Design a protein with these regions (language model features):
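Catalytic cores of nucleotide-sugar-dependent glycosyltransferases that transfer UDP/GDP/TDP-activated
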Residues: 1-133
Length: 133
């Protein structure tokens, strides 16, 4: 069973898109999968362990893919998730201006925050994403 869409939620799962795109890029199971990342107005102050990039480098062959997380702030690890995703969903009404600008620069599909009609909005967004090959 190959997933059509892998939906990642929040900063805790933000390295998953990088690993799927780089470490598992030859894995037939994930080759055609679309990655969607949901962003929320929650996170942490400061930085994660400064060895994070070193640990990720150990797994990945292309070190240029980890430059964003060399300073592992909340914003930077989310930028890494965005860079390695096919689409973004605003899971909160407020997303930082820096992340909003970064997403806009990438020109990727975005589902803005929805407080109602979630099911219909998500299904339509997924359908559009899958049909945009």
């Amino acid at each position: 069973w190959a997933p059509d869409i892998i939906h990642v939620h929040g900063w805790m799962a933000s390295l998953l898109p990088l690993y799927l795109r780089e470490f598992y890029k030859e894995e037939p199971l994930f080759k055609e999968s679309k990655i969607v990342t949901s962003l929320y107005n929650s996170g942490f102050e400061g930085e994660l362990n400064s060895d994070l990039a070193v640990k990720v480098k150990f797994d990945l062959s292309e070190n240029d893919k980890i430059s964003t997380i060399e300073t592992p702030t909340h914003t930077n690890i989310l930028k890494s998730a965005i860079e390695n995703s096919d689409a973004i969903i605003h899971g909160s009404e407020i997303i930082s201006e820096e992340l909003s600008s970064f997403i806009e620069e990438k020109g990727m599909p975005v589902l803005e925050y929805e407080s109602e009609n979630l099911k219909e909005s998500y299904l339509n967004f997924y359908a559009d994403l899958l049909s945009a090959n």
